[in-house]
Amino acid sequence: MIELALSAAVMVACLSGTVQFGYTFYIYNQLVTAVGNGGRYAAMRTYRAAAPRDIEQGKAAIRNMVVYGDARPGVGTGPQVANLKPEQVQVDWAMDESGKPSAVNVTIVGYTVDAAFGMIRFSGKPAVEYPFVGRYAPAETEQ
């Protein structure tokens, strides 16, 4: 009986660790997919920069694409990844020497996976960088 109790405790610990590890990888894979889709969207969209407000509105649309899968989500739309918020998506533009965007970086910062036996925090990962292939429109405004 003692052997059964000891081996059952070890087996339960191994099983629960495997479940937590698998769930964390499942969430991470969802984050990778969302960040990749948002990065591709950002790389192909029109970069409008008539005012600083236009740049920030463009970044908000990219963050919404990562979180909700839509640049303009409807009321009540839930996130693609559990508990992901637009504030946890960082969008940075790399500019060339003439001031035009050359690449876009999309990163997750401060996201916590609330697994069964602990919390795992992702900051700076996953991240993607795509070259900018969209249209540069410095005189246009976001709508």
Residue ranges and their predicted role:
Residues 1-23:
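N-terminal single-pass transmembrane signal-anchor helix
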Residues 10, 27, 44:
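Active-site-proximal flexible loops/turns
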Residues 24-32:
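Membrane-proximal amphipathic alpha-helices
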Residues 33, 37-143:
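Short, conserved structural patches
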